[in-house]
């Protein structure tokens, strides 16, 4: 456990070494976009993935838990794509801990407080591994029931969670909330409007030209986060992203979407991949959760069609947009009762 969990601290600061020997300075105190619950104990931890990258995470567990008497069902949470653990994933994790689960919300490789260079890059392989490394960490804890582990991915991490569930048989239950299939949207554009060889060729040429530029400059140019200033004619879902990432509601200084965004060549890893290729082989339970009015709803519904078995659920939240399922949208849109019931049923 000492090798996997590099450091933990309930309050104050902590440093942990990544694979390069550099130290990760973790923040002191509470810096989330949501209030701290008095029903939950919180601690900072770090652990390494299979690629040697050190990930930073927040652990949440019910107040009053005692080891070894209390071994909790556990859930690893991450997302949205381009967010940090202080945003939506932390809210999900803390809320589920209030309901009796031990949870972790982690920053993916190359982002937030986690290690890895270059910064602000995504990878379908490494980011799937991030979920699996979180499972490794949970299994190492004395207060976790190792046969009752689930994962929860939000937005682009919903698709990655399904991919992780397809390869990691230790994951007994998976929730994909307001999910994106990042490989599909990268290759085909929104609503599959760029689903042609010519369109993909143009994207590849642009990204490879950027590779040359980055190599020569020795830096990685960022693509920009959520558009700012917001154009008056922006699509509603872009306005919704702005309302979350660019306002006090969800802004965080370490969030890519709130600031400079991913590096421009990051999409190269996704454009030729098929993230959900083996979704139909997942034997354990999966819930796909989406808002009725979400622009991304088609990702979730199409993913659900790939799943097989009686232990798969599709939940459409009436009136909810994509971003309403980040933090409830001020109207309690996240169906935590339904999520809890799903995990209770399947983590047993």
Where are these regions (language model features)?
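Catalytic histidine-centered segment of alpha/beta-hydrolase-like enzymes
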Residues: 320-333
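Conserved alpha/beta-hydrolase
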Residues: 95-115
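The serine-hydrolase catalytic nucleophile loop
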Residues: 71, 82-94, 108, 300
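Alpha/beta-hydrolase fold nucleophile elbow
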Residues: 143-155
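Alpha/beta-hydrolase active-site loop
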Residues: 121-142
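N-terminal cap/lid segment of alpha/beta-hydrolase-fold proteins
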Residues: 23-70
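Short beta-strand/loop motif that positions the catalytic acidic residue
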Residues: 282, 288-290
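Alpha/beta-hydrolase-fold enzymes
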Residues: 162-247
């Amino acid at each position: 456990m000492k090798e996997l969990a590099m450091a933990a601290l309930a309050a104050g600061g902590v440093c942990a070494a990544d694979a390069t020997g550099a130290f990760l300075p973790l923040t002191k105190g509470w810096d989330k976009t949501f209030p701290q619950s008095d029903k939950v104990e919180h601690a900072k931890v770090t652990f390494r993935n299979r690629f040697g990258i050190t990930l930073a995470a927040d652990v949440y567990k019910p107040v009053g838990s005692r080891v070894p008497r209390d071994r909790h069902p556990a859930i690893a949470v991450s997302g949205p794509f381009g967010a940090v653990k202080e945003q939506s994933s932390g809210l999900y994790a803390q809320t589920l801990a209030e309901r009796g689960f031990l949870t972790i919300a982690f920053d993916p490789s190359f982002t937030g407080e986690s290690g890895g260079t270059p910064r602000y890059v995504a990878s379908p392989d490494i980011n799937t591994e991030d979920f699996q490394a979180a499972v490794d960490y949970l299994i190492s804890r004395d207060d976790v029931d190792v046969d009752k582990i689930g994962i929860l991915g939000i937005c682009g991490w919903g698709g990655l969670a399904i991919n992780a569930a397809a390869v990691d048989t230790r994951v007994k239950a998976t929730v994909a909330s307001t999910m994106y299939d990042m490989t599909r949207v990268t290759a085909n554009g929104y609503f599959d409007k760029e689903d042609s060889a010519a369109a993909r060729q143009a994207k590849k040429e642009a990204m490879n030209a950027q590779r040359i530029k980055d190599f020569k400059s020795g830096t990685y140019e960022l693509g920009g986060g959520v558009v700012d200033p917001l154009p008056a004619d922006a699509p509603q879902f872009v306005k919704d992203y702005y309302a979350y990432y660019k306002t006090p509601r969800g802004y965080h200084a370490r969030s890519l979407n709130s600031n400079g965004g991913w590096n421009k060549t990051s999409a190269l890893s996704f454009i030729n991949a098929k993230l959900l290729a083996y979704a139909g082989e997942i034997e354990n339970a999966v819930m796909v959760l989406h808002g009725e009015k979400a622009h991304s709803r088609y990702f979730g519904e199409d993913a659900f069609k790939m799943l097989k078995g009686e232990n798969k659920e599709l939940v459409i939240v009436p009136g909810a947009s994509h971003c309403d399922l980040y933090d409830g949208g001020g109207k309690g849109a996240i169906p935590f009762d339904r999520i809890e019931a799903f995990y209770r049923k399947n983590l047993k």
